[in-house]
């Protein structure tokens, strides 16, 4: 059959250009990526043949083979895995199905070191072949297909690709790389074997190369007989003492396609009523598309060394950054995704590994603060989801949280709740916090004034998830959590008797004017009262204890969500009785000026809080009216 010509989709063209011009210094990854693809193909066949043995075609000696030919200047990576149909070849090799590709390409900066890291997080897979090859040929036949229905794919990465139907005796895929002249040093047994041992030594499938013998003069002879060149015992089944740090790191890179080392790993063997082996990794950095809701996550589930699937049921969503492998002996080989969603063994494993991960993070936070800070900076926001999502582990997760505070000096989130409690003022039984859009907005919020004056530390929460998190985190270690922008604030125990008496006198003096201000503002406020929060600013707005904060209201509006009735939508206006503007208002006889100043005090407080102002132009005109 004649060959058909195709063009790459735009994203592939761009990615190929990046691979060829940006990753030449990381050329070794090509073999890791091709071996990984072959391993995946074999694992898929191993799984599908459980229910359809005919797919094996009487060949169950699964293996990956690596051959090289110095004369032809080629390296061939072949497998007897599941193979591909013509449609799958076009889909898998001509397009990038991975979501977020466009965003990834747009995020590249032109800085090679930064871009290499991004490319490593994205994973280039098969296309890494073009780092070392100027032409790639793929020959493949899907298991169960007729021998005459195989497919050949050819590309030089410059002019699209061609596809034609061929005959192929054995199922599976072979990738033939026509090596560029600057990479001909790869065409050596010891070089290729070294790359296998470096990057792919611990995979489950035998990797074979033809034996090489040397005579007394060191002359090399390549035999026709193949030998296995990798350690085929799965790394997660080996004893911790048998595995080096380098092997752990290379296996992480193999399963994650990350260029960077893992931050930490957790290798565990569980025996008893429930038996499984696990090897879990926490990356150093979050991938570029980490917040993409369509992105799949999950651990690789094996049953007695047979790969079953990537399964998100093994992890709660707030631990979706964890990579790794679970190998269970307590599940059937023919288990389906639907069965796993309601499987007691899976539920027990999930509970156990969640507990283990949180325990190891606690140890890390205690033993290596710098390393834990690296983890927190990358994954702290997603860990916060667990406070609301995982009630049984809420206290453990809360202990792992880190925040900026009024005493930490900058926006870096380094303070734990235990740290906060350890330096609470004598007599303080409440953990105070404020939520806001940014560190500066939080740190300069007028509602902090009384706390700063009294030396009471306040946690500054600026992540979007913080409002949701704090709706369920109401206490920690027996201490009540209190938002300083909600309800009344009782700091009387830190006041002198003179100041208490002074405030009571001011409250009586302002009783009449507060009612008049409320009448002027009508339904714009729930109440008007004197503030115990303010020392320098004239006004601020709060909501009642059970109402939705103005910050939360703003976020919901931005997300296009409507409000349920009775959620405390109207703000409470608080005034600083000692401020000149408030004193002027108290003594103002002109009703128009009184109304204007009342409105101005409300609007400027709303503005500082980042709340929505319905008519910004009216606010500006009001300010301009009284500028002298």
Curated annotation (Swiss-Prot):
UniProt cross-references to SUPFAM superfamilies, sorted A to Z: ATPase domain of HSP90 chaperone/DNA topoisomerase II/histidine kinase, HSP90 C-terminal domain, Ribosomal protein S5 domain 2-like
Segments for region (C): 555-628
Ranges where the record places region B: 338-554
CDD domains assigned: HATPase_Hsp90-like (cd16927)
Pfam family, one: HSP90
Listed PROSITE patterns: HSP90
Region span, A: 1-337
Cell compartments where the protein resides: Cytoplasm
Record keywords: ATP-binding, Chaperone, Cytoplasm, Nucleotide-binding, Stress response
Complex formation: Homodimer.
Protein purpose: Molecular chaperone. Has ATPase activity.
PANTHER family reported for this sequence: HEAT SHOCK PROTEIN 90 FAMILY MEMBER
Stated family: Belongs to the heat shock protein 90 family.
Protein name as it appears in the record: Chaperone protein HtpG
Organism: Francisella tularensis subsp. tularensis (strain WY96-3418)
Protein encoded by which gene: htpG
């Amino acid at each position: 059959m004649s060959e058909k010509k195709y063009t790459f989709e735009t994203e592939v063209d761009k990615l190929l250009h990046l691979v060829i011009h940006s990753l030449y210094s990381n050329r070794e990854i090509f073999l890791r990526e091709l071996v990984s693809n072959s391993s995946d193909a074999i694992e898929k066949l191993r799984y599908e043949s459980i229910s359809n043995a005919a797919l094996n075609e009487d060949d169950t000696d699964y293996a990956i083979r690596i051959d090289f030919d110095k004369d032809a200047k080629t390296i061939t990576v072949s497998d007897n895995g599941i193979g591909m149909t013509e449609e799958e070849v076009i889909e898998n090799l001509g397009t990038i199905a991975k979501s977020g590709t466009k965003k990834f390409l747009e995020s590249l900066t032109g800085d090679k070191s930064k871009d290499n890291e991004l490319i490593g997080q994205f994973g280039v897979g098969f296309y890494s072949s073009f780092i070392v090859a100027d032409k790639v040929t793929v020959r493949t036949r899907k298991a169960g297909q007729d021998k005459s229905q195989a497919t050949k794919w050819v590309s030089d990465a410059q002019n699209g690709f061609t596809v034609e139907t061929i005959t192929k005796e054995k199922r599976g895929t072979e990738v033939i790389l026509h090596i560029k002249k600057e990479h001909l040093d790869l065409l050596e047994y010891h070089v290729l074997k070294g790359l296998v041992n470096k990057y792919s030594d611990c995979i489950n499938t035998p990797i074979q190369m033809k034996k090489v013998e040397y005579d007394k003069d060191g002359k090399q002879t390549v035999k026709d007989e193949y030998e296995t060149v990798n350690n085929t015992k799965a790394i997660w089944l080996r004893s911790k003492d048998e595995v080096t740090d380098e092997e752990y790191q290379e296996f992480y890179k193999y399963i994650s396609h990350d260029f960077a080392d893992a931050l930490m790993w957790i290798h565990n063997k569980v025996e008893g009523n429930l038996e499984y082996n696990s090897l879990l990794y926490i990356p150093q950095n979050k991938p570029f598309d980490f917040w993409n809701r369509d992105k799949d996550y999950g651990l690789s589930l094996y049953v007695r060394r047979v790969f079953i699937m990537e399964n998100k049921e093994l992890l709660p969503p707030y631990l979706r950054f964890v990579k790794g492998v679970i190998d269970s002996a307590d599940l059937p080989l023919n288990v389906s995704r639907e069965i796993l969603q309601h499987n007691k063994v899976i539920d027990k494993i999930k509970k156990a590994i969640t507990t283990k991960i949180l325990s190891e993070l606690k140890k890390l936070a205690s033993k290596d603060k710098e390393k834990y800070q690296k983890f927190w900076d990358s994954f702290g926001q997603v860990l916060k989801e667990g406070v609301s999502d995982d009630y049984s582990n809420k206290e453990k997760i809360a202990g792992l949280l880190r925040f900026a505070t009024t005493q930490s000096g900058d926006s870096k989130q380094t303070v734990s709740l235990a740290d906060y409690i350890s330096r609470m003022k004598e007599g303080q039984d409440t953990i105070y916090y404020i939520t806001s859009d940014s560190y500066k907005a939080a740190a300069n919020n007028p509602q902090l004034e009384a706390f700063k004056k009294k030396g009471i530390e306040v946690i500054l929460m600026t992540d979007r998830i913080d409002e949701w998190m704090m709706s369920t985190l109401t206490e920690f270690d027996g201490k009540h959590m209190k938002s300083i922008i909600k309800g009344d604030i009782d700091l009387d125990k830190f006041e002198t008797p003179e100041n208490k008496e002074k405030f009571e006198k001011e409250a009586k003096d302002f009783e009449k004017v507060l009612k008049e201000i409320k009448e002027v503002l009508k339904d714009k406020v729930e109440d008007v009262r004197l503030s115990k929060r303010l020392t320098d600013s004239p006004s601020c707005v709060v909501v009642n204890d059970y109402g939705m904060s103005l910050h939360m209201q703003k976020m919901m509006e931005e997300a296009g969500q409507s409000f349920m009735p009775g959620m405390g939508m109207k703000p409470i206006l608080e005034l600083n009785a000692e401020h000149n503007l408030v004193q002027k208002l108290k003594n103002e006889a002109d009703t128009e000026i009184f109304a204007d100043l009342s409105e101005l005090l409300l609007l400027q407080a709303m503005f500082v809080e980042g709340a929505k102002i319905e008519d910004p132009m009216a606010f500006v005109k009001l300010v301009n009216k009284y500028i002298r």
